[in-house]
């Protein structure tokens, strides 16, 4: 006697399989494959470390080594930026699947969002190994999944809005790319923002990017957990998610025609 099928379980497994395929497709044909997910951010860290620590010879006063401080910040930032960029083009990248098979459109967003997690896990594993090597391990690490989940919700919520717009307005991809580049330079990823900074610089510490980057650093490097900052950013995530929900209901039916 055949066991009754579980539609929800089958859908979840399908989304997970397609998310894995989506991640592998990014590195299809390359010699090193998904290893590039770790190589690229490492090279980024080395370049910024060399430019600011060696070439520019700037002063750094912290018990934590600059390369490690930078690595943790970049791990959080790349999760945000790469995730949003990838989400923005989701409907266009999967247009063939939607048009030919009538694939569930909201699932496309979930596939792309989950796919972004894999690359983050690879680089984060390297960062955690460096943290252990530099002896920054503490009990506060148990809160890291909370910050990662908050970033994931932010990426999904923002990416959903951008992907809906991009499905009808292709230039949205370029706009998002430029916007993320600007946000990178004003977010304290490779530079330190004073906690006592006055207006307008003081506003930066309340931006999502700064909150996420500082949240990762506080947990992994300084053994502290700022519950107020996490609650604040979860409220921001929820607000963006709520804004995106009616947009999805209104716009998603026309996606296949884009």
Where are these regions (language model features)?
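Hydrophobic transmembrane alpha-helices and immediately adjacent juxtamembrane helices
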Residues: 1-258
């Amino acid at each position: 006697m055949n066991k009754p099928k579980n539609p929800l379980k089958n859908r979840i497994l399908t989304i997970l399989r397609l998310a894995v395929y989506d991640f592998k497709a990014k590195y299809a044909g390359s010699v090193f494959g998904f290893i590039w997910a770790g190589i690229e951010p490492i090279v980024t860290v080395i370049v910024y470390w060399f430019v600011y620590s060696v070439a520019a010879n700037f002063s750094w006063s912290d018990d934590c080594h600059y390369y490690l401080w930078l690595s943790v910040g970049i791990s959080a930032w790349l999760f945000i930026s790469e995730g949003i960029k990838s989400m923005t083009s989701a409907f266009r990248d999967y247009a063939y699947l939607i048009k030919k098979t009538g694939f569930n459109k909201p699932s496309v967003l979930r596939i792309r969002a989950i796919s972004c997690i894999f690359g983050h896990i690879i680089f984060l594993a390297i960062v955690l190994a460096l943290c252990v090597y530099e002896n920054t391990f503490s009990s506060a690490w148990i809160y890291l999944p909370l910050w990662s989940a908050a970033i994931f919700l932010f990426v999904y919520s923002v990416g959903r809005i951008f992907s809906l717009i991009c499905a009808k307005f292709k230039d949205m991809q370029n706009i998002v790319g430029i916007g993320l580049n600007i946000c990178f330079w004003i977010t304290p990823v490779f530079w330190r923002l004073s906690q006592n900074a006055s207006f307008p610089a003081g506003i930066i510490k309340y931006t999502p990017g700064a909150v996420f980057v500082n949240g990762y650093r506080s947990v992994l490097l300084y053994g502290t957990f700022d519950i107020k900052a996490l609650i604040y950013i979860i409220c921001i995530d929820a607000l963006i998610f709520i804004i995106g929900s009616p947009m999805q209901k209104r716009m998603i039916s026309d996606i296949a025609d884009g």
